């Protein structure tokens, strides 16, 4: 799950709080099964559901499938709350925002529950991205900003403690997959990073 740390960091950023507990189910189903290194098959997880609990009661979930790339949007982020839903879709660069204002207004059985009123759809992109490369340009931007911080002797955009917490979420997910039980972040981090 360490390969998903950037998603765990994004969850912290969006929620404005630190993960408390992780429950995960996953495994290796397709990728690298035919490879051998020193006589062993690599143990790279290629699919998982990871639920992350936060102190406020908020939850975030990662749905990882590294062998289902052939879809219109193989990366989707959804944020759902009592006011509505925000969806970011890649590589179509689509952002959708909808409100719950008209949900559940059925006049007759069989009619859709929503009318679509309040749904905004737009395409978004950063014109500074010269080469999309990995992660649809995000890696390019990360490298640019990191290089600038090094040149200016400035702070990294993501501080070390945030990075450590997100790696710990990945480790907790691995443990949860191995044991079938929730894992507490307190078992992976010192108290000052919780």
What is each model feature region?
Residues 6, 155-158, 168:
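Short, conserved clusters of charged catalytic residues that mark active-site
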Residues 7-8, 143-144, 170:
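A general structural signal for well-ordered alpha-helical segments in protein cores
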């Amino acid at each position: 799950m360490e390969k998903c740390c950037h998603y765990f960091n994004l969850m912290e950023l969006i929620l404005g709080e630190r993960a408390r507990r992780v429950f995960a189910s996953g495994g290796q189903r397709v990728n690298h099964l035919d490879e051998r290194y020193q006589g062993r098959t690599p143990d790279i997880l290629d699919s998982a559901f990871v639920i992350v609990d936060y102190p406020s009661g908020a939850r975030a979930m990662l749905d990882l499938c590294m062998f289902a790339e052939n879809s219109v949007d193989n990366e989707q982020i959804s944020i759902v709350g009592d006011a509505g839903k925000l969806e970011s879709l890649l590589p179509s660069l689509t952002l959708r925002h909808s409100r719950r204002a008209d949900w559940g207004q059925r006049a007759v059985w069989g009619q859709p529950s929503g009318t679509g009123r309040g749904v905004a759809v737009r395409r978004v992109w950063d014109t500074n991205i010269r080469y999309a490369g990995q992660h649809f340009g995000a890696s390019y931007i990360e490298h640019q900003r990191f290089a600038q911080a090094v040149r200016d002797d400035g702070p990294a955009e993501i501080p070390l403690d945030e990075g450590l917490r997100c790696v710990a979420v990945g480790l907790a997910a691995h443990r949860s997959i191995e044991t079938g039980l929730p894992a507490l972040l307190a078992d992976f981090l010192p108290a000052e990073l919780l």
